[in-house]
């Protein structure tokens, strides 16, 4: 098993755009002129998404043409319109006779409390991300959907840390499996291989870590206003030949990577979602893809927080 760049998969282009001052951005994954099969598994209690019904195994469409990860919560769902315009201009989409309709799925995270709540990803920003995808401007850290991402928010934003977007991919023989993830969790992030806490909830001194799970358990009977602005958004890529049903299962198995790296995870305060996309025709066992997928997803989560820089008054892991 060797590490490879997330950009080494065929038939994808990844572009990002952001409004740094406004504290938000979007990441667009274009899936080629013919699109690609995809599945989705949502485990969090508060998702903001678009066209997710397309990815159910019984839905008619067998491929989609792009995936958008963005900030802005439900407001940011406007961004997909820019991707649709970009693809329509290039004749990419589902042929309905009179035109071609691009099938664009999107999931958003909540970053409205980071900088300017009135600044959200829109069609113009997503169109710019598509243009950037032509040359490939993907970077881990405070970019794209990770621009306003934070973690460790159980006690409010004054106790959280800066996060971002991260990636990790491997190759085993001919099989490639990779993950891209924007980490905006209410919980803490751990290196699952060492048990070390990388980023998360900070004590009042701003320097000491608290354990979010222990804090939550102590508040079991205490009245509280739960902070609802969270969500970790991931995409699992593989060149294995998988249909929608199997991709939905692979996405579900990749959620194990969330559980390894984020504590607590899949709460009512999160909208945790994972897409899975098939980008090739390599024969591979579904369970093998899922096991590798969970591993690369956990590694990508750690990379997202380690690559982040302090911003908007929130310290990053490298500052602790």
Pin down the residues of each PLM region.
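Alpha/propeptide regions of enzymes that mature by internal proteolysis
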Residues: 1-320
